[in-house]
Regions:
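Glycine-rich phosphate-binding loop and adjoining helix at the ATP-binding site
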Residues: 5-30, 34, 59-118, 123-126, ...
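ATP-binding/phosphotransfer module of carbohydrate and carboxylate kinases, centering on a glycine-rich
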Residues: 1-52, 95, 119-120, 178-244
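Short loop/turn motifs enriched for small/polar and acidic residues
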Residues: 54-58
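Short beta-strand-to-turn element immediately C-terminal to the catalytic PLP-Schiff-base lysine
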Residues: 137-141
């Protein structure tokens, strides 16, 4: 179908939800959904509204509306989520805040970009995300997916494969060109020695890598020291400043 109208709302996840308990994070998301609906579609508050849940983390997806978080990435360390069904956690929070929303589908963000584009261009083969994190997916022949007999039984049909390629080089180190700045930055992340490829190219980390390079150049005398007086603390320089 065609989307006739689209309304966007943005919400900043509080630090307490990034490091707190599952209820802190998913209750915040549920409250944000409720706020958006109240402001933009109050007439739908009494209806049973279907919701698609894009979740850009490694998931063991058991069904279209069921997926277990394998491991947090991108600075998240919220407790009691890894190994649990993220759809069930969000659905419980939606019930707690009393918003009549039913999660009908769970989707990785790369798969979402690929499938959405496929509606208008059937030649598309790859979906890529380079934002806070980094990942890619592609269409594969179902018969080649031997890991899941139910999928491989579909023969020549195609199915999207979420690569989770941001984790490339985490097991076999140094296939990628890692610098001392990358190593120093990786050492202070919650998922040390994981998501190595993602940490080289994505917005969550580029600002910190740039900050370390700038500080080092100032220490060598290549830049005036007063230029870096406000950059001595990790994560003080965000990636968005690099585009100014």
């Amino acid at each position: 179908g065609k989307v006739e109208d689209r309304i966007d709302s943005k919400f900043v996840i509080p630090k307490s939800a990034l490091v707190g308990d599952a209820t802190d994070l998913f209750d915040f998301i549920a409250q944000s959904v409720k706020k958006m609906m109240t402001e933009n579609a109050p007439e739908d508050m009494e209806k049973r509204v279907p919701l698609g849940f894009t979740f850009s983390f490694p998931v063991d997806q058991k069904a279209v509306n069921k997926g277990l978080l394998i491991k947090w990435t991108k600075g998240f360390s919220t407790k009691n989520v890894e190994g649990n069904d993220v759809v069930e956690l969000l659905q419980a929070s939606l019930r707690r805040v009393r918003v009549n929303v039913n999660i009908v589908a769970l989707c990785n963000d790369t798969v979402g970009t690929l499938v959405a584009r496929y509606f208008v261009d059937t030649d598309v083969q790859v979906g890529v995300i380079i934002g806070t994190g980094s990942n890619a997916c592609y269409f594969e022949r179902a018969s080649a997916v031997t890991k899941d007999p139910a999928v491989s039984a579909r023969g020549n049909a195609v199915t999207p494969i979420n690569m989770e390629c941001g984790n490339f080089d985490s097991k076999y180190k140094y296939a990628l060109p890692i610098t001392v700045y990358d190593e120093e930055m990786d050492a202070i992340t919650p998922n040390h020695e994981h998501q190595r490829q993602e940490k080289l190219v994505s917005g969550m980390y580029l600002g910190e890598i740039a900050r370390r390079i700038i500080v080092h150049l100032a220490q060598l005398g290549c830049l005036p020291r007063e230029l870096v007086d406000g950059l001595c603390k990790p994560w003080m320089f965000e990636s968005k400043h690099m585009g100014m």
